[in-house]
Amino acid sequence: SPFSAHEEKLIVDLWAKVDVASCGGDALSRMLIIYPWKRRYFEHFGKLSTDQDVLHNEKIREHGKKVLASFGEAVKHLDNIKGHFAHLSKLHFEKFHVDCENFKLLGDIIIVVLGMHHPKDFTLQTHAAFQKLVRHVAAALSAEYH
């Protein structure tokens, strides 16, 4: 594993407290509000013209939950993140044509949301461990692109 035993403990302990639906919905909504041009990937989810449309779109919140649940799988596979995400990498590259830069952007937003939802637990050490995790997940999801 690329993570120390201490980093693994910090990641697993915080992740046990995460409300995936709430944090996932917040993370994807934030991404589409901060980077509105990313909304083109979700046009089939209905009207997303305004920030309020994004915030109140159930399909966006539901997909955010799905994305964060998938991210949570990395927590269970810290020793083989790349292997675990091989299929999703291929899918996002071949079918969805998602720019791999999005994985890094969303990873950074997930960090912000975790910090907002868990301010007492989100210590500097926990932040560092999760930053490392999102880097590894983004690299794994980008593997098919190289």
Curated annotation (Swiss-Prot):
InterPro entries: Globin, Globin-like_sf, Globin/Proto, Hemoglobin_b, Hemoglobin_oxygen_transport. It holds the Pfam family Globin. Red blood cells. Heme b binds at H63, H92. One of its GO terms (biological process) is hydrogen peroxide catabolic process. One of its GO terms (molecular function) is oxygen binding. Disulfide bonds: none annotated. One of its GO terms (cellular component) is blood microparticle. Keywords: Heme, Iron, Metal-binding, Oxygen transport, Transport. Residues 2-146 form the Globin domain. Heterotetramer of two alpha chains and two beta chains. Belongs to the globin family. Involved in oxygen transport from the lung to the various peripheral tissues. This is Hemoglobin subunit beta.
